[in-house]
Amino acid sequence: MRLRHLTLRHFRNVGFAALAFSGRQQFLVGLNGQGKTNLLEAAGFLTALRSFRTTDNKLLIQHGQHTGAISSELTHEQLGDTKLTIKLRRDGKELWSDATRVTRLADHLGRFPTVVFSSQDLHLVRGAPALRRRWLDLTLASMDAGYLRALQTYSRALADRNALLKRGNAADAELDAFEQQLAPAAVALLATRTAALALLGAKLAVAYDRLCAGDAAEKVGLHYEPSFDGPSTEAWLARFESSRGRDAQFRTTLVGPHRDDFSFVVRGTAAKDFASEGQQRSLVLALRLAQAEWGHEKSGTRPVLLADDVLGELDPLRRRRFWASIDPESQILATGTSLPDAELGEWQVFEVKSGEFEAAAETPEL
């Protein structure tokens, strides 16, 4: 997929910007706080109608404005030339595809993929389990409609069961009604997560090896940590039933896919506790490379890669290896406070200042 044009209106600190992209490499250069990340955020919003920086869409609308908009023109491997427009309001958003309003998330999710490389990705290694679950759910839901349906079913039934538990004195028959919905959905989520993390772990290891010059001592992977690994609906029903007393005590559901986690592993140990900062940064870069490769294999569509000033903390050799690891047919939009290394070929460069984007008079061969 190629992003040809991107237009922002009243988005973050950008009053208006219209950028035309040529070639596959665009670089946004400028000081911090000028709007580089805001443009990548807008491009990433195309994938799942959500920001990679915040869950509060009101923050996306420029201060003093009531609405905002993102418009894009893309060339897609299966869909051809397509125009997307996202209209933002303080109470919601609308998506339009070629002048037709899209009303179901399932009809859009994953069709126009992007993969974001962000400094916030370090939280996937260091942060709370909820961050890793959210990333995993978004990634799998964008690739697998069955996973999205199971996740939606599970989330609704979980909310209803928790409401009963919070109320107190829930009857077994009431709990059972929601457990009958939870159990088969949990089986589906567990199976998909298990297979996906095994595959992503293998791809992560290959990508990490490329970034780290084949250091065989640094064997890496992903380790799935389910709260319960029941193989069948019957096993899950029994587990939910046996947990009712404790769940009633704490007034919430204490077991299920919503309590799962996974960890990054280096040399057989948890990267969260034992890996250096350099290893952790390389792990999350490798994870995103693995995600992009797998997404292309699953959908036939190359995601647009969005790299938000993620390489500044890496040594020059590892930075060069990262750029060399990018699929040569993929488009990449990158940001930084200085231009990329000289041997990385020709970039279309935009200078960014105070929410304004100016194309370089001549794109230097950097």
From Swiss-Prot:
Annotated InterPro entries: DNA-binding_RecF, DNA-binding_RecF_CS, P-loop_NTPase, RecF/RecN/SMC_N, RecF_2
Keyword Zinc: no
Pfam families: SMC_N (PF02463)
GO cellular component labels: cytoplasm
Gene Ontology MF terms: ATP binding; single-stranded DNA binding
Main localization, broad class: cytoplasm
Record key words, sorted: ATP-binding, Cytoplasm, DNA damage, DNA repair, DNA replication, DNA-binding, Nucleotide-binding, SOS response
Binding site for ATP: G30, L31, N32, G33, Q34, G35, K36, T37
Subcellular location(s) per record: Cytoplasm
Biological processes, Gene Ontology terms: DNA replication; DNA synthesis involved in DNA repair; double-strand break repair; SOS response
Function: The RecF protein is involved in DNA metabolism; it is required for DNA replication and normal SOS inducibility. RecF binds preferentially to single-stranded, linear DNA. It also seems to bind ATP.
Family membership: Belongs to the RecF family.
The protein's name in its UniProt record: DNA replication and repair protein RecF
Species annotation: Opitutus terrae (strain DSM 11246 / JCM 15787 / PB90-1)
Gene from which this protein is expressed: recF
